[in-house]
Amino acid sequence: MSNICQRLWEYLEPYLPCLSTEADKSTVIENPGALCSPQSQRHGHYFVALFDYQARTAEDLSFRAGDKLQVLDTLHEGWWFARHLEKRRDGSSQQLQGYIPSNYVAEDRSLQAEPWFFGAIGRSDAEKQLLYSENKTGSFLIRESESQKGEFSLSVLDGAVVKHYRIKRLDEGGFFLTRRRIFSTLNEFVSHYTKTSDGLCVKLGKPCLKIQVPAPFDLSYKTVDQWEIDRNSIQLLKRLGSGQFGEVWEGLWNNTTPVAVKTLKPGSMDPNDFLREAQIMKNLRHPKLIQLYAVCTLEDPIYIITELMRHGSLQEYLQNDTGSKIHLTQQVDMAAQVASGMAYLESRNYIHRDLAARNVLVGEHNIYKVADFGLARVFKVDNEDIYESRHEIKLPVKWTAPEAIRSNKFSIKSDVWSFGILLYEIITYGKMPYSGMTGAQVIQMLAQNYRLPQPSNCPQQFYNIMLECWNAEPKERPTFETLRWKLEDYFETDSSYSDANNFIR
């Protein structure tokens, strides 16, 4: 009878975390209140941590890359309730259960949990990540193919060059580079080529380091639905810059989490208008968009709390010593990243209205993200150098499409026009477009089909993309998805791959 009871308990224990025998007196529990989870939607799902995470609140669970976790509740998209399945490697005590950011874990034994699998990243992004100095020859990753849905590509670091191979797939199952050697799984594929190069440029070494850590979708589980937060929880540490709407600060939330804080000038927006727009903005989630975390709107100055990008705006970055030394490869890459974020907004039928280098932010490891999307609709602006009065509103005339200037009607195609001006800012290292011209003169010249001339250092191929964005007919301008792949494939003909049979074209 005792054996039957023991087996029954072993079966039920994972589903009854509140009664777990692991929560005994010998374990230091940082947050006893977090031991009892909400009603679980699915049980028994085991996950692997992809990145380190340090708890931000008493309800959170700290973990390290490689830790095994059991997810007990997935009620909220961005934050799951989970428990540790193993003791910490250094022997220290730890909280047993708590909330975790869902984009930091992958289901155990899944392809996404493999350290060498990078998901749906483009070829140029794969090259950039493999070329980080921490990676050595033989470092590799497998990614979803850009051109062939459901298929995969292998990217390998060979000295100072990244080589790419298409992993072919049989209809009946199996993966191969050449038909003389077929593998039933990608794990077998990787295992084989880590033992021998067998036709590859080099033998596979260690997986590419995952240096780019995603931002959690919210500050914490508590701010998922209640994102009007106490301003006393925010410390303003260092002013990063100032603009027409207020100041941007590096801040600290809850004494744990670095954030960016935009403090708005009193009267710069109507709080109710902003909250309506922000509710939409908070649900827009993409790696190339700045994540809106929380707001403080009950008194002036209004705070907008977002993820922190330590290098400031792209405009300032291009004009400083570091940005002025970048070359065409990096310029095309930053343009492609912005196009990727804008393609997501395009897919969600959302319009930016103020796309410019000043509204793109620069992070670590050459990461660029679109900021302030949608805010132009609610800001009351007074910077006459950028925003000029048209039809009783103020517009950034030098970045605004002619049809939007005429009628004050914005569309994703007017954003495409602005993207063309952004390309001009990128290639000229942050120069003011239409330098020396007033807004009124720009409007007059555009009516005569004038376009910004090709900068002296601008390749014809790059300038052609700009001209496409400035098509007088909005419907004839490219989509952001088209702009994304054009920029990601910009150097396609300049490849340095040695194996023409396996090189991805």
UniProtKB/Swiss-Prot annotation:
Enzyme Commission number, as recorded: 2.7.10.2
Protein name from the UniProt record: Tyrosine-protein kinase FRK
Active site (catalytic residues): 354
Catalytic activity field: L-tyrosyl-[protein] + ATP = O-phospho-L-tyrosyl-[protein] + ADP + H(+)
Localisation: Cytoplasm; Nucleus
Pfam families linked to this entry: PK_Tyr_Ser-Thr, SH2, SH3_1
Lineage of the species this protein comes from: Eukaryota, Metazoa, Chordata, Craniata, Vertebrata
Residue positions where Phosphothreonine is found in the record: 178
SH2 domain boundaries: 116-208
PANTHER family in the record: TYROSINE-PROTEIN KINASE
Classification via InterPro entries: Kinase-like_dom_sf (IPR011009), Non-receptor_tyrosine_kinases (IPR050198), Prot_kinase_dom (IPR000719), Protein_kinase_ATP_BS (IPR017441), Ser-Thr/Tyr_kinase_cat_dom (IPR001245), SH2 (IPR000980), SH2_dom_sf (IPR036860), SH2_Frk (IPR035805)
Main location: cytoplasm
Domain SH3 residue range list: 42-110
UniProt source species: Homo sapiens (Human)
Gene Ontology CC terms: azurophil granule lumen; cytoplasm; cytosol; extracellular exosome; extracellular region; nucleoplasm; nucleus; plasma membrane
UniProt KW Thylakoid keyword: no
Record key words, sorted: ATP-binding, Cytoplasm, Kinase, Nucleotide-binding, Nucleus, Phosphoprotein, SH2 domain, SH3 domain, Transferase, Tumor suppressor, Tyrosine-protein kinase
